[in-house]
């Protein structure tokens, strides 16, 4: 698993998965599955076409940002937060030579209220997001390799 982070509130993680890229991409691209594999996502409420409300556990308590899908392709999805959080995320699934795939997650986030953003930085929101991202891709790997999709 590869991990890197840039400026505050930014995470980039990769995970090799021994499952067909098209199966992994189809599972990930259905955002309703987020609560099954994204650690910290407690619920996903569909609001309309390509719009959802998530309930997330965070270092400062539960938050419920709106999410809008901005890209929904065969090998990648990306989204932006529409409330509570600024930023978004992207998951890309690339086939490898052995019949598996490489899953890449990048995310950038800042709480919209500066006071909460400062508090989140003080309690380690970036480390929390990185750890949850690593655990999420490990969970996705397990689900896909165990064929639980």
Which stretches of residues belong to each language-model region?
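Hydrophobic ligand-binding cavity/cleft-lining segments
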Residues: 1-49
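Hydrophobic-ligand-binding modules of eukaryotic lipid transfer/binding families
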Residues: 1-16, 22, 100, 128, ...
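Short Gly/Pro-enriched turn/cap motifs at secondary-structure boundaries
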Residues: 5-6, 80-84
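Short, surface-exposed coil-to-beta transition loops
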Residues: 10-12, 62-66, 86-90
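Generic structural detector for well-ordered beta-strands
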Residues: 14-18, 45, 55, 68, ...
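Beta-strand elements of well-folded, non-transmembrane domains
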Residues: 17-19, 58-60, 71, 85-87, ...
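Short, hydrophobic/aromatic-rich segments at coil-to-beta transitions
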Residues: 46-53, 71-80
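Beta-strand/loop substructures that line and gate deep hydrophobic ligand-binding cavities in soluble
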Residues: 83-135, 140-142
